[in-house]
Amino acid sequence: GFVELSPVLWKKIKPALSAGRVQSVAVRLIVEREKEIKNFKAEEYYRVVALLHTDNAAQPIRAELNKRLPSKEAAMEFLESCKNATFSISDLTVKPLKKSPAAPFTTSTLQQEASRKLGFTVSQTMMVAQRLYESGHITYMRTDSVNLSSLALGTIKEEIATTLGDKYYKARNYHTTAKGAQEAHEAIRPTYISHHEISGTAQEKRLYDLIWKRTIATQMADAELEKTTAEISIGGRQEKFVATGEGIKFDGFLHVYMESTDDESNDAESDTRLPELKKGETLALDEIDATQRYTQQPPRYSEAQ
């Protein structure tokens, strides 16, 4: 463990050298992840997806089986059993959801988001940000503060009210929790909020656009969503199909900006909207498909993490 590492180093080398706590933890995590990758054996499985429809809906419902099937034989047997099965809505839940915008950019969150959204490396992000800063387009790009100046907050409020209307505005104060954070600096934001676009290289324009949208979104209203989950029973079988959909009642900050995540695999499914459904309603099967997949080895830690 990292706790014992420092004294050993200290004894063997010289009193001035210490393995930094954060560094030791990072090294241990990387070593453990490498072991996991080395010992990993990919396992085959089958993922089953069905398209079904109700009598009165033109749009099909995409539903996924709630378990993975371990082999081709199991998948074939399951598909065969679905040919003449009856499908019905066994459970239906509708939950209201609220999403709030993320805080303004710090150096590390800008690096992570530029990596995910724009495919930039850490050094590329910093190089482009440096040019934007030197051209007077953004505030200083090395900061761990999420604060915005009162001047910036006033301008953002004006911008939202003018372009989108008052219902999209919500005043928010963000506070830096990191110990020893440089509170003297602001978060990374456009120098002039009224400048929606800038002249410059394609990379500079893209990074500026990301910073501008994120900054505006920080002072916007929550997005109000509705998440519907439908469980579909398969006559005579224990397995169930599950269909999920998210409906946007009020887009709020999503009108301007959606934060990325490292796992984007669920995005396509979560964006689908389900037709009006009722518990007990029967469905007709349009299409069913079993896809061979393999379990994925754990990813290595990326530079931005």
Over which residues does each language-model region extend?
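Polybasic, glycine- and aromatic-enriched phosphate-binding surface used to engage nucleic acids
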Residues: E239-D271, L277-K279
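Structured DNA-binding interfaces in DNA transaction proteins
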Residues: M76-D209, T218-Q219, K227, D263-Q305
